[in-house]
């Protein structure tokens, strides 16, 4: 994480407007002082169809072909996408996946997979509860990964990487994963970012990736 201080209170409306201008292909949000531009849809529901976008595996812009052939990143992505599709297969009908494909953003390029299914009797909020936390933000197996995070991670995530979204009375809605975000508190803005760790991860490369993922908020601030 990173904390930025300003002489005046942060205006979340300004940050949201800037993120919408700079990162229009993401899901932007501002909820109770948490503002961000997430590229990853945990789960959405509309007209009886559920959809999710899974991201895992990241590189600098322009290096997508190397990413698409990286055994390490493809394995990381497979673990993340399988964690989502396997849960939807238990709770939904006719689960279909499309990917992995390259998703290009101004600051990074991701491996992405879209997952779609028929809702059946499942409610959107049931899917949110079952999917969170995904392997992309927690690890797998989930219980073992959560235990290690509690033991080793010295940063309090708060609402970072949690579900953020909306739902209506008909059960339609969208819940993104709260990524590329910051928590505003008066003159302080705490930025969050992270990277998936695999056995063959390079710590320096993961740090560089994490710094790149902070660019949306930094760009919004003009830093």
Label the predicted regions.
Residues 1-4, 85-86:
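Alpha/propeptide regions of enzymes that mature by internal proteolysis
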Residues 3-79, 171-194:
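An anion-binding catalytic pocket shared by soluble metabolic enzymes
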Residues 29-33, 99, 160-161:
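Short coil/turn segments at secondary-structure boundaries
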Residues 38-40, 114-223:
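Conserved hydrophobic core element of enzyme catalytic domains
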Residues 51-151, 222:
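Contiguous alpha-helical scaffold segments within structured protein domains
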């Amino acid at each position: 994480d990173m904390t930025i201080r300003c002489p005046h209170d942060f205006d979340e409306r300004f940050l949201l407007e800037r993120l919408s201008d700079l990162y229009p292909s993401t899901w932007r949000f501002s909820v109770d002082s948490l503002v961000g531009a997430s590229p990853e849809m945990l789960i959405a529901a509309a007209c009886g169809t559920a959809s999710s976008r899974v991201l895992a595996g990241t590189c600098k812009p322009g290096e997508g072909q190397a990413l698409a052939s990286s055994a390490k990143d493809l394995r990381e992505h497979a673990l993340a996408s399988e964690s989502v599709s396997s849960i939807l297969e238990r709770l939904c009908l006719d689960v279909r996946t499309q990917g992995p494909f390259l998703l290009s953003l101004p600051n990074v390029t991701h491996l992405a997979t879209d997952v779609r299914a028929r809702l059946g009797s499942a409610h959107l909020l049931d899917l949110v509860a079952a999917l969170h936390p995904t392997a992309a933000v927690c690890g797998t197996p989930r219980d073992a990964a959560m235990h290690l995070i509690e033991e080793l991670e010295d940063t309090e995530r708060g609402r970072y990487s949690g579900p953020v979204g909306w739902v209506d009375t008909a059960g339609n809605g969208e819940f993104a994963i709260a990524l590329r975000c910051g928590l505003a508190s008066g003159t302080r803005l705490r930025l969050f970012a992270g990277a998936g760790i695999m056995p063959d991860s390079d710590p320096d490369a993961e740090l560089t990736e994490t710094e790149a993922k902070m660019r949306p908020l930094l760009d919004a601030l003009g830093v």
